[in-house]
């Protein structure tokens, strides 16, 4: 009953040979096919930009992206892929955003920003303040990763009240496995944020079909069951649609 074919995925690694996502065209296409089968119809490509780790030249990412756009047309005529970036915050990011060197999400006011798991709250707060001062609206990637935000409604609300939006990964929505679930703590955090109404978007952060596939349909179903169909639509369709169309949430 929860099958939705209008999902919009604003966090994905679908471009081959540019980061830790797909290695080649075939892997890119396999991801696109799986996402489409799950009901995703628009994917924002957010390859990593991270100083010292993922430093693929912008023109190479753009060139490979245009090939992925072509692959999407082969997968299905109604599968839409648009351009973006997952931006790991470092001191040089502000200048690069200001000069439009690194892309925002589909050319909108929204930018997907990530931090390391151990980044202190004051650094997250100050980084997001700097981004906001450029007139850019941060979407904070996978908030369930950051230790400083664990069980801390007050901090997350503060970031939201500043004007930021919060994203969690679909993999973190899944039920924890009984044994050997390395990511159990992230699933607990994600559930806390959902319970408190602190999540604006669920997205896949898919990298490959082996260990980081999209779990969009599964996550959609779980959220629809637990929080209602309207909430599921809001997190997987309505809000992501507003983001890629440069509208306010």
Q: For the regions a protein language model found, what residue spans apply to each?
A:
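Charged helix-capping and loop-helix junction motifs
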Residues: 24-27, 60-62, 96-97, 151-157, ...
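Mid-to-C-terminal alpha-helical segments outside catalytic/metal-binding sites
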Residues: 216-249
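Non-catalytic positions within long, well-ordered alpha-helices that form the structural scaffold/packing
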Residues: 36, 132, 194-195
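Active-site beta-loop-alpha junctions enriched in small/polar residues
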Residues: 13-15, 19, 48-49, 84-90, ...
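Active-site neighborhood of phospho(di)ester-bond hydrolases with catalytic His/Asp-centered motifs
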Residues: 8-10, 44-46, 82-85, 139-141, ...
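Extended substrate/RNA-proximal surfaces in nucleic-acid metabolism proteins
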Residues: 55-167
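An N-terminally biased module of ancient metal coordination in phosphate/nucleic-acid-related enzymes
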Residues: 1-79
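Short acidic/histidine-rich active-site segments
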Residues: 196-213
């Amino acid at each position: 009953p929860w099958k939705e074919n209008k999902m919009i995925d604003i966090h994905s690694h679908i471009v081959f040979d540019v980061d830790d996502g797909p290695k080649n065209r075939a892997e890119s296409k396999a991801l696109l096919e799986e996402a489409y089968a799950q009901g995703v119809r628009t994917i924002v490509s957010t390859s990593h930009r991270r100083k010292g780790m993922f430093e693929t030249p912008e023109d190479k990412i753009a060139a490979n992206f245009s090939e992925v756009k072509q692959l999407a047309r082969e997968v299905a005529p109604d599968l839409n892929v648009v351009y973006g970036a997952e931006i790991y915050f470092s001191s040089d990011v502000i200048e690069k955003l200001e000069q439009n060197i690194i892309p925002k999400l589909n050319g909108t006011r929204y930018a997907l920003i990530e931090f390391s798991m151990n980044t202190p709250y004051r650094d997250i707060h100050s980084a997001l303040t700097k981004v906001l001062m450029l007139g850019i609206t941060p979407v904070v990637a996978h908030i369930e990763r950051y230790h400083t935000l664990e069980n801390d409604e007050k901090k997350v609300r503060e970031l939201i009240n500043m004007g930021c939006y919060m994203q969690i990964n679909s993999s973190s929505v899944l039920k924890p496995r009984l044994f050997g679930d390395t990511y159990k703590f992230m699933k607990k955090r994600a559930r806390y944020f959902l319970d408190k109404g602190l999540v604006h978007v669920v997205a896949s952060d898919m990298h490959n079909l082996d260990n980081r596939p999209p779990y969009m349909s599964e996550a959609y179903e779980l959220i629809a069951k637990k929080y209602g169909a309207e909430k599921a639509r809001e997190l997987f369709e309505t809000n992501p649609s507003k983001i890629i169309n440069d509208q306010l949430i």
